[in-house]
Curated annotation (Swiss-Prot):
ATP binds at residues 14-19. The lineage of its organism: Bacteria, Pseudomonadati, Chlamydiota, Chlamydiia, Chlamydiales. It catalyses: 3'-dephospho-CoA + ATP = ADP + CoA + H(+). Its main location: cytoplasm. Pathway: Cofactor biosynthesis; coenzyme A biosynthesis; CoA from (R)-pantothenate: step 5/5. This is Dephospho-CoA kinase. NCBIfam families: dephospho-CoA kinase. Residues 6-202 form the DPCK domain. It is found in: Cytoplasm. PANTHER family: BIFUNCTIONAL COENZYME A SYNTHASE-RELATED (PTHR10695:SF46), DEPHOSPHO-COA KINASE-RELATED (PTHR10695). Catalyzes the phosphorylation of the 3'-hydroxyl group of dephosphocoenzyme A to form coenzyme A. GO terms for cellular component: cytoplasm. It comes from Chlamydia muridarum (strain MoPn / Nigg).
Length: 202
């Protein structure tokens, strides 16, 4: 049985990673969002959730779940707390991804295995994947998207971006770079072309 190509989609905040993954999923790929997996741990009764409460305090518990806005307020702008939070969540995310890969290969029904990992290089996870796709967009365009989607502030955008390594460094390391400065239709077309190229390498 041939192994399924492992693809990571990464990029800076609001670059278009999720949209790219949606296109891949529409075309028959199995897709995992690392952020969604980490968010699933943010409940008090998981081992990760309890460690997050121990780290940040019981005030982050709201209606029997861990309030992501309260967590963000505490960790963005405090690098030590942010790194400690990542050390709690990321091992579980990687474990989930790798366990799912084994199951998806056995299912033999998907064209690619795609994982959206925003902090791929920052957590040293790139080597596990066969290909890395970097989604790139100008800072002002990304900021506009972020503000429109979240209703957040320029400061909250800047604080999130501060955790990411430089775009130039990631461009040098990625296998494929897809620019997303134009329309949604233009971007989706580029992702579809990328999918075809990846399928051609199998």
């Amino acid at each position: 049985m041939l192994d399924l190509l492992k693809i990571s989609v990464t990029g800076d905040p609001s670059s278009g990673k999720t949209e790219a993954c949606q296109v891949f999923e529409e075309l028959g790929a199995f897709v995992i969002s690392a952020d969604k997996v980490s968010h699933s741990f943010l409940v008090p009764y998981t081992s990760e959730g309890q460690r997050v409460v121990d780290l940040l305090g019981p005030e982050i518990i709201v209606e029997n779940t861990l309030n992501r806005k309260a967590i963000a307020k505490k960790v963005f702008g405090n690098r030590d707390l942010l790194l400690s939070l990542e050390k709690i969540l990321h091992p579980g995310v990687c474990r989930f991804v790798e366990e799912n890969y084994t199951q998806v290969v056995q299912a033999q029904k998907y064209s690619l295995f795609v994982v959206e990992v925003p902090l791929l290089y920052e957590i040293q996870y790139a080597d596990w994947f066969d290909r890395v796709i970097l989604i790139s967009a100008d800072t002002e365009i990304r900021k506009e998207r972020f503000l429109k989607k979240t209703g957040g502030s320029d400061t909250s955008f800047d604080l999130r971006c501060a955790r990411f390594s430089s775009l130039e460094e990631k461009i040098l390391r990625a296998d494929v770079v897809i620019e997303n400065n134009g329309t949604k239709e233009e971007f989706r077309h580029k992702v579809k072309q990328c999918f075809k190229a990846l399928k051609g390498t199998i």
